[in-house]
């Protein structure tokens, strides 16, 4: 799984072979985290942004329909997801998803921390089942890029 973030600060996130890599382009640094025993938790969180099926979401989250909203002219179902895993609950209290039921994709996501802070993600120009280039799953680093592996 790969994510390219363009604002407010450009970065790339790659989850591959049980390792999460965060490339911060401004400081030219990759921070690598081994999922190890937390692999299931990492995969459940990453899948929120990558089209997990309803069955997969129900394995990891309590799901409540909060209503219908229109986002960018698209009729969406607003879902409130609460993590089932205690480890996930310690860093994520719940997630709001605005799902397009026709395309089965999330258009907007709001991740809430226990502190009340949140991160809002809004997807535009979504292409379903488009061709994906192989290089999207490689970080665009240089020979000068610093690699950090926190303990």
Please place each PLM-identified region on the residue numbering.
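Short, functionally important structural connectors and interaction interfaces within domains
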Residues: 7, 25, 37-40, 49, ...
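An acidic-aromatic
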Residues: 1-44, 119
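Flexible, surface-exposed loop/linker segments and immediately adjacent secondary-structure boundaries
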Residues: 28, 35-75
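Gly/Pro-enriched, hydrophobic low-complexity segments
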Residues: 31, 58, 64-150
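Short secondary-structure transition/capping segments
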Residues: 12-25, 51-60, 110, 114-115, ...
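Short solvent-exposed loop/turn micro-motifs enriched in small/polar/acidic residues
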Residues: 5-7, 15, 56, 61, ...
């Amino acid at each position: 799984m790969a994510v390219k973030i363009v604002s407010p600060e450009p970065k790339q996130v790659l989850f591959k072979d049980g390792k999460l890599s965060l490339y911060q382009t401004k400081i030219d640094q990759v921070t690598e985290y081994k999922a190890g025993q937390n692999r299931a938790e990492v995969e459940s969180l990453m899948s929120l942004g990558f089209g997990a099926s309803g069955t997969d979401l129900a394995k990891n989250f309590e799901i409540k329909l909060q209503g219908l909203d229109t986002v960018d002219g698209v009729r969406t179902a607003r879902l409130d997801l609460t993590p089932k895993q205690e480890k996930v609950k310690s860093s994520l209290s719940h997630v709001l998803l605005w799902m397009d039921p026709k395309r089965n994709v999330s258009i907007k996501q709001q991740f809430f921390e226990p502190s009340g802070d949140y991160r809002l993600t809004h997807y535009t120009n979504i292409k379903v089942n488009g061709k994906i280039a192989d290089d999207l799953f490689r970080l665009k680093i240089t020979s000068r890029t610093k690699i950090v592996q926190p303990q």
